[in-house]
Amino acid sequence: MSILPFLAVAFGGAAATLLARRWPVASAVIGAAALVAALVAAASIAPGQELAVAGGTIVGSAYGRLFLLLGAGTGLILVVASRVALGASWPANLPGALLASLGAAGLALAVRDATTAVAATIAGGLAGVIVTLAGPPRPRDVAVAARELRAIAVAGSLVIVATAWVARPLGILAQEPAVFGLAYLAVAVGVAMRFGAIPFHLWAARVADAAPEIALPVLMAWGPAALAIVAIAWVDGSIAPVLPVAGQLPVERAAVIVVGVASLTLGAVAAWIQDDLEHVVGYSIVQDAGVVILALAALDPSVWAPSRTWLLSLLVARTAFAAWTMAVHARFGTRRVPELAGWARRSPVLSAALLAIAVASVGWPGLAAFEARASVIDLATDDPIRGLLLASVFLPLLYYGRLFLVGFGRHSSATANAVGDRPRRPSEPARRRLPSGPVPSPWSWRTWRSWDEATQSVRWMRPLRPLPGMTSAALDLNRALLVGLLVLILAGTSVGVAAGGFGLPAAAAEPAPQLPGRGE
C-alpha cells in the first residue's frame, strides 16, 4: 500500500482531534483512535511503491515506514500515559499536534523534491505551536510561541532558499565555490536552529519553560529530525557531487563542525547543571543533535546510514526521557532535581526506566546506535578533536548519574509522602440493592444508555454492576504504577532501537531518494 492512507489518517485525525477540543474526553478518544489507525496505516506502507500526485511523485520507503511506525507507537503511549497521569490537566492538543507532525514528516520523507520536503517539515513544525498555546494563552506563553514561530520561519526560509537556489540553472555561477558554500551553510544553520543547537539554543530553553514536558519531543526532536533527514539527503545529492569543482568548502565545514562540537559537549554539561527536569530533557536533545550537525559536516555519502540510525535512536530515547520526566512530575509534584531526593527508592519501575534510557542514549561499543554515532564523528572530524568527541559521548553519564545519586538519597518532603509501586486493590464496594419497580426491557435502546439499567435488565449481567466503580477505584489507586509501566515500555523500546532492532540497520542503509537540486 502507498503512503497516501497514512497521510489521510494523520491529517484527518489531527483536524478531528483539534476540532473536538471543547469536549476533552471525545478529543482524547478521537486522538487515540487516530494514532492507532495511523500505526496500522504506517505498517501497511510498501517500500518502493510510487504514486503520482499533483505532478509530483511520492514513494514509500522502509526507513520512512519505520520512522512513522515508531512515531505513531510512541505517540500513542505518550497520549495514554499523559491522560492517565495528568487527568483533566493533560495537554489536550497533544494528539492533534502529534498527528499533524507525523503527517508532515511522512510527506517530507516520501516526496522527491527537496524544496517541497522542506516546506512539509516547516508545516509540521508549526503544529508544535498548538501545544505551546494549550489552554487559555498567557502573555508569557504567547511570547514563547512567537519565539518558536520565528525560529521555525527563519530556519525554514534558509533551507528553502538554499535548496531552491541550487536547484535552478546556475549558468556561470556553477563554477563559483561560494554559491555552493553559502547554500550548504544555510541548510546546516537551518537544521541547527530547528534543533536548538548551540548557539541557537535560547529559543529552545524558553520553549522548555512554557511547553508541557510531554510535548518536548514533538517540538524539539521529531519535526527537526525530518528536516535533518531531508537536509542530509540534499547534501548527499547536491553538494557532495560538486566538491571537485567547488572545493572542500573548508571554511563552511569548519563553522558547521564548531556548532556540532559545541552542542555535543556543552549540551551535556548544560543538562548536568540544570535543576529543572524539563531543561535537562531539552539540553539532552541539544547534545544528541550535535551528532546530526556533524553528519552534515562530513560531506561524505558514507554518513547516510549511520546518521539515520542515530536519528531514530535519538528520537525514541528522548521521547522516553520526556515521558519519564512527566511521570516523575505527576507522581512527586515537582520537577526540580534537588527536591526529588529519594525518588528512585520510592519507584523501582521509574528507576529501571531511567536506566534503560541511559543505556539507549549512551550505549557501549557494538551497539548499533553507539557505532553509528562513532561513525559520524569519525567521518566528520580528524584527530585530536575526534578522540575528544569520542570520549565526550559518555558525558550524559553526568546528568544520569546525578539523577540516580539524588534518587537514592534520603527522602525529601516531596517523595516521602508519594505513593510507591506496590499494586493496591480497591476495597469491595457495598452491595447496592436493585431498585424496586418494573425491570427495564433489554430490547429498548434507552435501557443501554445507563449501565445500572442495562445490568438490571439482563440477569447474567447483574454481578457485573460494580465493575465500573471498581475499575475506576483500581485505576485511581494504581495510577502512578500504570504510568511508570508505560514509561518502562517506552524505555525498553528505546533500547531495542539503539540495539538495531526493528530492522533499523537495513532501513537506514537504503539509498538516498533522488532529490533534485543539483545545479546545471
Q: Where do the model's predicted regions map?
A:
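Alpha-helical transmembrane segments of multi-pass membrane proteins predominantly involved
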Residues: M1-E520
